[in-house]
């Protein structure tokens, strides 16, 4: 089965205070990840060693970096239009959460956009079932 790489920004609610780190999981995030694991996907959370791993249950692994190239059927989910770990080549990219307001410089393109992690998981599961 294909791999799904999850940036922490796709899993956490943004803090109202920039001085306070984002630690609260978005509602339904653990359940959405559980559905992906149950469907046979390899779910990998991208987090540095000093960042705590969110409680997502069994079957979820951790990596510090994205692979240089993602193969066909591989997914990358992020809540940040400019991810700290960069953007991969290949695979399917998904921007999760509300889209920031457009400024003078256009936002980077993503293959898909989803309102939350549950909607992104539903899209992945639907596309997998239809393949």
Predicted features and spans:
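Asp-based, Mg2+/Mn2+-dependent phosphohydrolase catalytic module
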Residues: 3-8, 12-18, 22, 35, ...
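Substrate-recognition element of Asp-dependent hydrolases with the DxDx(T/V) motif
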Residues: 24, 29-56
